Amino acid sequence: MANTAPNAKTRQVMVGSVALGGGAPCVVQSMLNLPLADVEGNLSQINRLQEAGCEVVRIAVPHKADLDFFEEICKKSPLPVVADIHFSAELAIEAARRGAAKLRINPGNIGGLEATVPVLQAAKAAGIPIRIGVNAGSLDSALAERSDLTLPEKLVESATAYVEFCHGQGFYDVVVSAKAHDVPTTVATYRLLSQRMPEVPLHIGVTEAGTLFQGLIKSASGLGILLEQGIGDTMRISLTDDPTEEVRACWTLLSALGLRRRDPELVSCPTCGRCQVDLIPIAQEVEKRLRDVHRPIQVAVMGCVVNGPG
């Protein structure tokens, strides 16, 4: 039987007060989708995400002018805030100094290994981890053009080079992600990452997964495989939808796999010719009412004598 327990072999890092890796439960994340200048809007979204069960929140920091807003959000946020940085090592350094609980940098656009040195120094001084976040759509051009490697191998090669560089600089609080938009590539990549770097905590996800229905199917199929095999220390289900739906999806998947429970599980039959009641609207109404209940209970709604009372 595959191992569904949290991966105790990975190095544990702290994101604020949240333990990630080292046998800790898989941490649920989401990402804010408002401009940083809307401080109150972002804080309101963080509060809603926290109520939904989010444990770590990420926010894009695209411009130097955003840093003051970012700092204010970090100070007032009830959740640890991860700074999502692309294209600028300087922004990563400043975000570390201004309250980020963790940095996310992209090897494909941060400016090369040497540009990462001051970022590592800033993170070490702040006592925060860094996620090396590789994406299939933004691989380093030299690596992307190699014909001797498959796409999963390219993603793993990029991540491995940066992790080894970080370790060589004496920085070990590293988390890795390597995402693609399709499930087979995602699963193959994370399996290979887990084999190549078993001690490094992994942030799992299917990037650009799509709108609610498609995104849920793709993410559940891909992440479900990985989590069932004990791969994944933290997760985000990326959806083109309200971020709270991402959090609900994460908890539903973790619950379905028997890994973590915080909300009710609705058990309802699909209906057939034996159904004695108009079950579909009843089940939908029960599901709606259960949204505000946060207890790991089971609630059954059945429509005939085969599966249960009507």
Question: Which residues does each PLM region occupy?
Answer:
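N-terminal amphipathic alpha-helix/helix-capping segment at the start of soluble metabolic enzymes
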Residues: 1-31, 36, 124, 288
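Structural preference for beta-strand elements that scaffold enzyme active sites
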Residues: 10-12, 25-29, 56-58, 80-84, ...
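Active-site mouth loops of central-metabolism enzymes
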Residues: 15, 22-41, 60-62, 79-87, ...
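Glycine-rich, proline-tolerant flexible connector loops at the mouths of alpha/beta enzymes
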Residues: 33-42, 50-77, 104-112, 174-183
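Glycine-rich phosphate-binding active-site loops on the catalytic face of alpha/beta enzymes
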Residues: 53-55, 98-113, 206, 229-243
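Alpha-helix-loop-beta-strand connector modules within alpha/beta enzyme cores
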Residues: 64-85, 118-130, 192-202, 286-290
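Hydrophobic or amphipathic alpha-helical targeting/insertion segments
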Residues: 90-131
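Catalytic alpha/beta core domains of metabolic enzymes, predominantly
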Residues: 134-135, 143-301
